[in-house]
């Protein structure tokens, strides 16, 4: 089997997303492991700058049966950000917008926003976001949701799932969906 079986699909992806697609040795190596130290080399790392780019790459991955691993900053100790099947890694760090709706008591945050940034944005509006994993300055809310992060405040206030009331995302087909 070829070390890079998805080269044609990756070329198509580069045509559609351009600079968001990194196939360099260094770029792929940097996304090959997380804090668990489990390591598998992907064929490409895609860093979407707009939400719709996630849908484009998932649609293409689904069409060509390319395995996809979603990654924030790789702080997980569970191995969930390591691309165990190779394929493509979606690096969500650029999708980090945060909007606090103080009147409704809601935070709208991109998957790449760090927990620490969300906490500070909420505090600036008089609100408190309790989940506080020890890696809060580096870990992303997308990863927190995926792993149900808690931290020291978890016993008193609850963990991430207790504070999520709606999600936006994409199905493997690239279709945009909203839950909640």
Where are these regions (language model features)?
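Conserved PLP-anchoring active-site segment centered on the Schiff-base-forming lysine
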Residues: 69-71
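N-terminal flexible segment immediately upstream of the FAD-binding catalytic core
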Residues: 1-59, 75-105, 120, 134, ...
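FAD-binding subdomain of flavoenzyme oxidoreductases
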Residues: 97-101, 107-180
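Residue-level detector of anion-binding/catalytic polar loops
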Residues: 66-67, 128
């Amino acid at each position: 089997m070829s070390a890079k079986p998805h080269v044609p699909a990756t070329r198509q992806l580069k045509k559609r997303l351009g600079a968001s697609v990194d196939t360099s040795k260094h770029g792929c190596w940097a996304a090959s492991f997380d804090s668990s130290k489990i390591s598998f080399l992907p064929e490409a790392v895609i860093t979407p700058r707009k939400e719709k780019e996630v849908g484009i790459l998932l649609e293409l991955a689904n069409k060509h049966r390319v395995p996809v691993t979603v990654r924030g900053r790789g702080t997980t100790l569970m191995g969930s950000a390591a691309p165990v099947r190779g394929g493509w890694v979606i690096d969500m760090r650029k999708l980090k917008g945060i909007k606090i709706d103080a009147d409704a008591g809601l935070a709208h945050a991109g998957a790449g926003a760090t927990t620490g940034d969300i906490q500070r944005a909420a505090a600036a509006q008089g609100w408190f976001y309790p989940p506080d994993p020890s890696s809060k300055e580096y870990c992303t809310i997308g990863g927190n949701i995926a792993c149900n992060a808690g931290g020291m405040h978890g016993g008193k206030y609850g963990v991430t799932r207790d504070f999520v009331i709606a999600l936006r995302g994409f199905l493997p087909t690239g279709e945009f969906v909203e839950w909640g």
